């Protein structure tokens, strides 16, 4: 497929330890404000909100068309006391993650799938309308099943490459032979090009006003539309999951939603774990300090003021990636006050995305092999003159250059053959040439 009406010379420069290389071109009730209130705003907490390689000026919402955080009015009077977007047909079934794929379970398999189905007017009832955690996870797990990832790894993969459907790509699941394997076949990469993230954003949630903005996003994205049913978004969370028994409570008999489990805080130890916030319930509560009351207006932590940290009523609805039977139905409540935990910075922020459809103007099909993909370097260039010795425009595809966006190549793509561990056969991929 030509880039324009005039002929172009397309050249591919490959540098690395190549075993062989071949290429073929182709075609509640309203909440009151804290005494000192911080409003919802964009934030870039390190190291989990954006790639360090992009620098301090990188705006992760750039490319999105919807209003950024802080650009909409948060009118809490319109909010219902409960929202659960996991009951919408656009939300995929819960399943149990394998390996360290939780970040991609949240960012891609859950949030990206939900948002893309809303955009397309489809439902997540088949593999043709669901998106796998494993395509993006295998891009950054160094071919190591124990290696985790940030949500932004999936969202940046979706921005630069795209995400194929489960029907086309499949799932890695418990198959260790597929850990670190890259998709082999131009059609898989070509399909992925169409499904993209336009922008993503992290915001702090440490005050009542910030919680209210998050509630509004979950209800109708803080964009009420007259005559239309509200359609809310989802939010990414990074929780600390060690010693969960110490922070898990069961709502007692006689209280609202008795028998349901609720986290009153993040776990006191352990590493981060990606989970998905699908809604909220302002009536869910638990008597955290044991005074016989479930209150929102008492200074229970003794710091001399009443803030979000003192609230015992109001909770997010969280979907975990530990299977449909975990905590009865794969979901649990998380008190709003847990978001203030000063010992777990990651747990003080929520992530969101905007998705888009993209039709590439021109593509390139490559078939190549490399015995160590962390050393591979590929540059694609074009020139208007067929006899040109220098490209007029160049493109260095992230996957074929060790994903420099994510840092050190060996920590991302792994020191394995291009196709995957133990497989030195040629890999066929597709590259979107639209940026050229």
Locations of regions flagged by a protein language model:
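Bacterial N-terminal signal peptides
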Residues: 11-20
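Substrate-binding/charge-relay-adjacent region of secreted/lumenal peptidase catalytic domains
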Residues: 62-163
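Sec/Tat signal peptide C-region and signal peptidase I cleavage site
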Residues: 23-25
């Amino acid at each position: 497929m030509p880039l324009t009406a005039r002929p172009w010379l397309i050249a591919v420069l490959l540098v690395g330890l190549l075993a062989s290389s071949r290429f073929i071109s182709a075609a509640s009730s309203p909440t009151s404000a804290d005494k000192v209130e911080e409003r919802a705003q964009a934030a870039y907490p390190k190291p989990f909100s954006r790639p360090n390689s992009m620098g301090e000026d990188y705006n992760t919402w750039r490319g999105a068309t919807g209003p950024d955080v802080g650009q909409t009015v948060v009118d809490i009077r319109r909010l219902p006391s409960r929202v659960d977007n996991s009951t919408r047909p656009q939300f995929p079934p819960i399943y149990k993650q394998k390996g360290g794929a939780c970040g991609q379970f949240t960012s891609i398999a859950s949030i990206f799938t939900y948002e893309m189905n809303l955009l397309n007017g489809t439902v997540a009832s088949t593999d043709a309308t669901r998106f796998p955690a494993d395509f993006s996870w295998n891009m950054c797990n160094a071919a190591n099943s124990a290696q985790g990832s940030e949500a932004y790894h999936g969202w940046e993969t979706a921005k630069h490459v795209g995400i194929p459907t489960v029907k086309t790509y499949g799932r890695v699941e418990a198959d260790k032979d597929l850990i670190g394997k890259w998709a082999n076949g131009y059609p898989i990469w070509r399909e992925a090009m169409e499904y993209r993230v336009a922008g993503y954003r992290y915001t702090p949630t440490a005050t009542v006003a910030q919680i209210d903005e998050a509630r509004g996003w979950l209800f109708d994205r803080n964009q009420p539309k007259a005559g239309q049913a509200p359609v809310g978004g989802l939010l990414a969370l990074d929780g600390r999951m060690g010693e969960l028994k110490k922070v898990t409570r069961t709502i007692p008999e006689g209280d609202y939603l008795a028998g349901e489990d609720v986290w009153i805080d993040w776990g006191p130890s352990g590493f981060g774990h990606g989970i998905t916030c699908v809604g909220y319930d302002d009536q869910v509560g638990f008597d955290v300090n044991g005074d016989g009351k479930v209150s929102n207006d008492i200074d229970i932590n003794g710091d001399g003021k009443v803030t979000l940290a003192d609230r015992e009523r109001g909770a997010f609805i969280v979907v975990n990636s530990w299977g449909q039977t975990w905590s009865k139905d794969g979901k649990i409540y998380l008190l709003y006050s847990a978001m203030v935990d000063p010992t777990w910075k990651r747990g003080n922020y929520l992530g969101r995305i905007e998705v888009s459809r993209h039709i590439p103007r021109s593509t390139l099909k490559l078939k190549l092999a490399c015995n160590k993909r962390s050393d591979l370097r590929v540059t694609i260039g074009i020139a208007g003159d067929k006899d040109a010795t220098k490209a007029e425009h160049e493109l260095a595809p992230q996957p074929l250059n060790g994903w420099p966006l994510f840092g050190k190549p060996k920590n991302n793509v792994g020191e394995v053959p291009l196709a995957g561990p133990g497989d030195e056969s040629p890999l066929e991929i597709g590259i979107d040439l639209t940026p050229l």
